[in-house]
Amino acid sequence: MSARPEPITLYVDADACPVKAEIYKVAERHALHVHVVSNQPIAIPRDDRIHRVVVASGPDVADDWIAERVSRGDVVVTADIPLAARCVKAGADVIAPNGKAHTEATIGATLATRNLMDDLRSAGQITGGPKPFSPRDRSAFLSALDLAIVRLKRAGFTT
């Protein structure tokens, strides 16, 4: 008797996520469960598979909630590089809202770059922020999310 395959679950670091609507559409198409995690109530579609999780305010509270639950077969959507590193370490697929997939091979350099840029900003060497979110970013995100889901299905995870 074989064990029942694990379902693919999406976790969204939702407070500043610009692709929530796209996540809901993809989740509906693939019949996936989604945990929308935030420090404040966020409107979500009426769908039994989409779960709103409101955590206490405070640094990293939403990140901790997500990181403590994810494992292989889950997909995390976040722009937070330290959270991405924690989730990659736990075996989850991690995608930034701009479509960049974080993997074991790339997360170390990405985290180091983030830390360097944070230090430069703190020292006043860099005053600008990230570039504006674009339609190209949205399209890249949709492609990356679909690719991650298809890859997980091929690996035996279910919806």
Curated annotation (Swiss-Prot):
InterPro entries in the cross-refs: UPF0178
NCBIfam families: PRK00124.1
Protein name: UPF0178 protein AZC_4000
Span of the signal peptide: none
Family: Belongs to the UPF0178 family.
